């Protein structure tokens, strides 16, 4: 178990804790995706599928939605060769959850799977990779499945042209807060580490995971 005083924003538990702040989560999504979000909700996965997905060892870090979009935000610390398959798995989790809640597949919301990586998953040096389903024969044909994958590479923050995104990626890469938004995140992180409830919850989570594995 990593000592509480050593936790940073990029640790899974701390990341999830910070992103439970709706103002921070909303601002992050607006900065990264350049969209306007009116209000965020934090839906719970249907009880019938939560145990199944958790048994697979995969849980959504941050699952939120607004009126017509759903977002899954994941922090990725270790380089994994199956990153693409993980995005597919998370996508299926969100779609099944929405269908179980009674939505017709024709009414599935536009979805964003967002991976914030502390490494370059594709080794192309880009700070940001966007993936949509495309037609190989004619790029103008749009299947309109509403599924978008956004993958950010924090190590390339210096080449990101958008100053807000660059500052956030730099914070992930170096833990150095250089603007008001990353200052706010860093403040929440530092307060959490001296918060007794946070410390108790973190310890309890680690005990549960030790018992499971």
Residue ranges and their predicted role:
Residues 2-5, 9, 13, 67-76, ...:
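Short, charged alpha-helical interaction segments and adjacent helix-coil junctions
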Residues 1-148, 158:
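Accessory alpha/beta interaction modules
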Residues 137, 144-158, 162, 167-174:
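Upstream accessory/linker segments immediately N-terminal to the RecA-like ATPase cores of bacterial MutS
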Residues 18, 32, 155, 172-175, ...:
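Generic structural signal for hydrophobic core residues of well-folded globular domains
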């Amino acid at each position: 178990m990593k000592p509480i005083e050593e936790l940073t924003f990029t640790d899974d538990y701390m990341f999830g804790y910070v992103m439970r702040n709706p103002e921070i989560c909303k601002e992050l999504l607006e900065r990264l995706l350049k969209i306007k979000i009116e209000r965020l909700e934090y839906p719970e996965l249907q009880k019938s599928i939560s145990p199944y997905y958790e048994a697979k060892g995969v849980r959504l870090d941050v699952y939120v939605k607004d009126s017509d979009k759903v977002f899954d935000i994941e922090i990725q610390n270790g380089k994994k060769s199956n990153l693409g398959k993980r995005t597919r798995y998370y996508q299926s989790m969100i779609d099944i959850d929405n269908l179980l809640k009674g939505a017709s597949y024709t009414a599935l919301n536009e979805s964003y799977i967002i991976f914030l990586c502390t490494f370059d998953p594709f080794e192309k040096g880009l700070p940001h990779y966007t993936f949509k389903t495309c037609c190989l024969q004619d790029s103008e044909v749009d299947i309109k499945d509403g599924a978008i994958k956004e993958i950010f590479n924090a190590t390339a923050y210096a080449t990101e042209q958008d100053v807000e995104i660059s500052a956030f990626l730099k914070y992930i890469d170096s833990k150095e807060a250089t603007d008001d938004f990353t200052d706010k995140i860093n403040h929440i992180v530092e307060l959490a580490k001296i918060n007794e409830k946070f410390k108790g919850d973190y310890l309890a989570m680690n005990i549960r995971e030790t018992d499971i594995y």
